[in-house]
Amino acid sequence: LVFTGSGRVGRLLLEHAAQTNLKRIYLELGGKSPHVVFDDTADLEAAAQAVVAGIFRNSGQVCIAGSRLLVQDSIHDAFVEKIVAITQSMRVGDPLSLETQIGAMSSEAHLNRVLQSLESVKSIVAGGDRILTETGGYYMHPAIVTNMGPKDRLVQDEVFGPVLTVTRFTSEENAIDFANATELGLSAGVWTSHLSRAHRMVSALRAGVVHVNTYGGADNTVPLGGYKQSGNGQDKSLHALDKYMNKKTAWIKL
């Protein structure tokens, strides 16, 4: 059985399999993926565009959505200004319109859950409000929340919506600690102009996919899978076929 969904349901499936026929269970249970932006990033404008697209496309309803932004302290304010400006320029509306950049949430119940996650947050610098109620659709302005600590609930919980949290960091070690400080580990993004730093970050980040100076790249020839409570097994590539096969060995003496 292969399941994509919440950790709660994934654990229930594992329990039922253990109590019944020991059916193999493979799980993809979402993520809380970080973008780590260092002050040596060569093109901060490109990084800002990628960060915004990485969280707000499909209204944040994507398993690898880059919902946590970690920015080095020396460029924090300037970078936040960039992403706020880009976000506020994006058009929210009818997904069938060619001018629309951000569509609706999947249901009113889900929209309300996302909005409720923002109710106790004080430092919203963009969005976070419901709009276009007259259309009967489930729309909101994408939200950016600053001054977040790595252990804050909004930083830890998968919102699965257009909400980006922003946290400052001071050093590479600090960034690694913050990026790994969740129970999920599906994807991550790193922005730096130093290849040696890129390799160190790829090795240190507890995520199944790490993007460097880009985000969201995918191909059917390479595996996609999570660390920690983002699940087990792999999708895509030849590795994904293993979970669908029962292997058998036969010894025959003639």
Sequence positions of predicted segments:
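ALDH superfamily catalytic-core signature
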Residues: 7-149, 212
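Conserved C-terminal structural/oligomerization subdomain of aldehyde/semialdehyde dehydrogenase
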Residues: 36, 91, 132, 139-254
